[in-house]
């Protein structure tokens, strides 16, 4: 089969969109290694006047990702994020108003690959978040390990993400006056191994820590489903029990890292590459579940609220799936 390349007269806007998403994908795949390499080179070539002050700062600043982070508005306002959002494009949908006098936990589903819906909607100034939810500040919680890499952590925090640790969640949810939203991708990295186009498998049955945090702080729970998130990449088939899945599960269990073998389109052609497909992403924010603050919740209370959350998440999916091209017979699978 002959590979057809993109025409030379491709509109400039589409070229800029492709470039924006390419840098974002490469930041996931390579930026950590580049940042580590820079630090190693500074040490090897004895640029002590650069690396020693930074390492002192690194030590001093270690807990910042657990204390609200350090977002920079000018970074969140970079034009690159406008083109990033338009590539798919990414849309935020509100189903109900939220009270800015309260704090909330948004449970984001599914994880998919690279989670562009969560980043595009909650970490850039080009999102409709502020328009749809005035008076709110969003905090996207990501794995703590991302903040362990020098230099990379500064770039990551500048876009708004914070740690997903208990301390970080408590810091956000205990802020007086309300108007704070903690966004947690509840399926975690392991759910990326389930991210096949047209599938809706969520790793959530054993994820109950967020429920305990909601009860402890009296934060309302809000299910969020991002339609189209799993359709951006294809993944080499990895059913449970296969040699590939066995290796992937072993890597996750030992290192906490999930490595799905993915492919989609290329930069200049549509047949194969690391670029995600241009698929619409509709991130739908559901109805809030009121939570009464309980400083020492029992396991029964946690289980009851967890079950309520699963039911509301399933309702959200079923109510909106038809609008976004999902057949009526499809349903969520909880693992």
Swiss-Prot record:
It comes from the Eukaryota. Its EC number is 2.3.1.22. Glycans are attached at residue 180. It is a multi-pass membrane protein. Pathway: Glycerolipid metabolism; triacylglycerol biosynthesis. It holds the Pfam family DAGAT. Disulfide bonds: none annotated. Belongs to the diacylglycerol acyltransferase family. Involved in glycerolipid synthesis and lipid metabolism. Catalyzes the formation of diacylglycerol, the precursor of triacylglycerol, by transferring the acyl chain of a fatty acyl-CoA to a monoacylglycerol, mainly at the sn-1 or sn-3 positions. It uses both sn-2-monoacylglycerol (2-acylglycerol) and sn-1-monoacylglycerol (1-acyl-sn-glycerol) equally well as substrates, and uses sn-3-monoacylglycerol (3-acyl-sn-glycerol) with lower efficiency. Probably not involved in absorption of dietary fat in the small intestine. This is 2-acylglycerol O-acyltransferase 1.
